[in-house]
Amino acid sequence: MKRRNRAYRLLRLTAVYLLLLPFLLLGWLYSRLPDRVYLEPGQALLLPRFGWVEPMGLHGSQNAASTQVVGSYQTTLSLGGWLPIKNIRTVVTERAQVTVCGTPFGVKMFSEGALIVGFSDIDSPGGSTVNPAKAAGLRLGDRVIRIGQIRTENNDAVKEALEAARGSAAEVIYVRSGEQRSTTLTPVWDAAAAQWRAGMWVRDSSAGVGTLTFVDPEKGVFAGLGHPISDGDTGESIALRSGEIVPCEITGCSMGTVGSPGELKGKFLSAHAIGSIRINGENGVYGTTRTGFSGQTMPVAFAQEVETGEAQILATVAGETPRTYHVCIEKISDANPRRNMVIRVVDKALLTRTGGIVQGMSGSPILQNGRLVGAVTHVLVNDPTRGYGIFAQTMLEQAEQVATAEK
């Protein structure tokens, strides 16, 4: 009897799972499908990565996804043309053409506020050690934007504000994790340094080397890196006050190994800016330029056109001239906008030279079927032959926002 009851419960549980399975699969599919799709006029909506998914009405009524008219439309994606899964936005637009670069560039950025990158205790007149910044609750990575009545736009302004307080409590306005906060800090006199101090080290600027992905010469905008410029000590994305890009050449490379990513080494060739940075965002560095850049004019692929399989990257690992290297796109995903692709380097020349993907190659264009499909963003620390990439379409959208703002 007990055995029969156990079998009955198991059968009932199995039936429940079987009933829930289709809904779970539809939920998974919903989360994987894009929210927006771009098409050329007259181009039908095809999703190669989801061959069984197609727009509703494909077998009957007009398919808005293949309209000839430029504009934005709502499209219902379905399973086999009959079971609705998700409503998405279909944008019909002319395909963009950009100058694909792959050239190195130097970055000089000044942050909005002074970033806390370290702490050091101070010997007080009473003989004990104190740290006013820590006592005020400040942390590594906080961005100080005002002390007292003085805006702390740079390191000198922080020093000036502490001198102005002269040991009195001063209100500190700072930003942590995107949220503005306030606290009170009381500077102490450092007899050894002969100045008022808070016990914190701050940084107001950053410099580095990256790779230029593309330039739109008609709109006068550029895109690079594919990820934000972050502070080397805190890992925090730098809030942009102003910035520029300058000519650069690659002078050396440390090879990447398992657990230790390699790095391109470069030097600035000139102090003359070739572009102004307008955005330091999650999807890269974007700005304006009137400089003519060498490169090949190529169409930008829509996200749904990117395929797994053979591809190429344009990367500069020596000097100023990019070369084409063979890679394989192993995985594609719409779920994480900063990690749309997993790519693997298969080019023997690049593997011999760098060990795979190294720091400084971020922004290297990914090409497939004669189109710009994306850019390299990160290396997998435990496997330097592999890395992540971002869709070129995403970077183009951000660059077009810069162009619109400059009008």
Region spans (language model):
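PDZ/PDZ-like groove recognition
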Residues: 110-135, 139
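Conserved PDZ fold ligand-binding element
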Residues: 133-156, 366-369, 373-378
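PDZ-domain C-terminal substructure recognizer with occasional recognition of PDZ-binding tails
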Residues: 77-79, 86-88, 92-94, 159-199
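PDZ domains, with a preference for the canonical peptide-binding region formed by the helix
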Residues: 66-68, 146-179, 383-385, 390-393
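Hydrophobic membrane-insertion alpha-helices, especially the h-region
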Residues: 9-28
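Serine endopeptidase catalytic core focused on the charge-relay Asp
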Residues: 184-359, 368-369, 377, 383-398
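A short glycine-leucine-enriched loop at secondary-structure breakpoints
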Residues: 129-143, 166, 356-360
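Interdomain regulatory linker/hinge segments that flank or connect interaction modules
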Residues: 2-3, 56-100, 278-325
